[in-house]
A protein has these predicted regions:
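Beta-propeller and closely related beta-sheet repeat lectin domains
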Residues: 22-27, 94-97, 149-152, 222-226
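Beta-rich carbohydrate-recognition and catalytic domains
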Residues: 1-21, 30-145, 155-216
């Protein structure tokens, strides 16, 4: 995972630097004077076969805008002890979406359908990180696919947060991805309140990715982030 300085128009403004040597699907959150990066790593068994994925948290100190690694560790799999369903089994964890609850606590959208938010204690005065709350709510089902992940939420009005998610549905011979948005209460229990009925973005069916040697025959679009 790399970091790249950008200007006000989000254009590259300097060289890229390696931040984390192994990982994918990062979501970053500034919490006080720290940068928290939630990401996943692919697990492999003794035969080097894919055996799921693990969510990771890397904490960085921010000094003069430059991150210095403090610690990085794996987060528990299936923290809510949910029954395995689809790719949300006990061995697969990814796409947790972080947002600030307080200077020492982070909320994590664990899933949209069913809706689950987990509170994580990130007090810098304590070395250990632990889950300190669980807030289920009404499921957000979407006819354009099963919702996964999303951008770290931003304020929407006085009392809500908004996040832009991605979803996928099988169309013909491939998965087609779409982007939507949902709003939920800023305060506990973080109840979801609204969702876009139609996609804000829809990936083209013929993406042309095969031209670049990418074997995945999917039509993919992901929201990377949102600027307030």
């Amino acid at each position: 995972l790399w970091v790249l300085p950008v200007d006000e128009q989000l254009r590259p403004a300097g060289p890229a630097e390696l931040l984390i040597g192994r990982g994918e699907d990062p979501r970053a959150l500034v919490l006080g004077d720290r940068l928290l990066v939630f990401y996943c790593v692919i697990d492999r068994d003794e035969a080097d076969a894919v055996a799921g994925s693990t969510m990771m948290l890397a904490e960085f100190a921010l000094a003069d805008g430059r991150p210095t690694l403090l610690q990085a560790f794996g987060l528990p799999k299936n923290p809510l002890q949910l029954a395995a369903a689809g790719d949300r089994g006990a061995v697969w964890e990814k796409n947790w979406v972080p947002f600030e609850i307080s200077p020492t606590q982070v909320g994590l959208i664990y899933s949209h359908d069913p809706w689950h938010v987990i509170a994580l204690d990130c007090d810098p005065a304590r070395d250990a990180r632990r889950f300190v709350g669980h807030f289920p709510g009404p499921s957000l089902s979407w006819r354009h696919g099963h919702i996964r992940g999303g951008t770290p939420p931003l304020p929407y009005g006085d009392d809500q947060l908004i996040t832009f998610f991605h979803a996928s549905a099988v169309v013909g011979s491939r998965k087609v991805y779409a982007v939507g948005a949902c709003c939920f209460d800023r305060a506990a229990p973080y109840t979801p309140r609204a969702i876009t009925r139609e996609p804000l973005l829809l990936a083209p069916y013929n993406s042309g990715a095969h031209r670049f040697g990418w074997p995945f025959a999917g039509s993919v679009v992901f929201p990377l982030g949102a600027q307030h």
